[in-house]
């Protein structure tokens, strides 16, 4: 019979770093509210949550790496919004942010969850930041909690 390893949604005693891009701040702040709600609902103490605001999404991966390298965080949650415009800038930023965040997690071994919206329109971003399509900040925080707990089962 195989052993199934699953993470409990219990943030009690865990320390989280959250990074929020200020560009498209209306969206970023809704994502942050969702992430904080998920963490506190699942037992996190607000005093164990650090929030770093950075200029935009492009700065998120390096900030996540610096946070992870401190060894102070059980998980890092990355939040922001990259919304398509009329130039190829969106494609470059969206690709680099997603690759960069994944690289930080693989390089450091610290769970880094991706709650950076990459949408075609502002309406899609609003939907994913707490209206019709739920709150992806909440989802990213839940992912962070569960991943930490799965990793703890490997010990």
Curated annotation (Swiss-Prot):
Taxonomic source organism: Geobacter metallireducens (strain ATCC 53774 / DSM 7210 / GS-15)
What CDD domains does this protein's entry cite?
A: Lumazine_synthase-I (cd09209)
Q: Where does 5-amino-6-(D-ribitylamino)uracil bind?
A: 23, 57-59, 81-83, 114
State the protein's purpose. Answer: Catalyzes the formation of 6,7-dimethyl-8-ribityllumazine by condensation of 5-amino-6-(D-ribitylamino)uracil with 3,4-dihydroxy-2-butanone 4-phosphate. This is the penultimate step in the biosynthesis of riboflavin.
GO MF, one term, reads: 6,7-dimethyl-8-ribityllumazine synthase activity
By its UniProt entry, which InterPro entries does this protein fall under? LS, LS/RS, LS/RS_sf
- Protein name per Swiss-Prot or TrEMBL: 6,7-dimethyl-8-ribityllumazine synthase
- Recorded E.C. number(s)? 2.5.1.78
Please name the catalytic residues of this protein: 89
Q: Which family does it belong to?
A: Belongs to the DMRL synthase family.
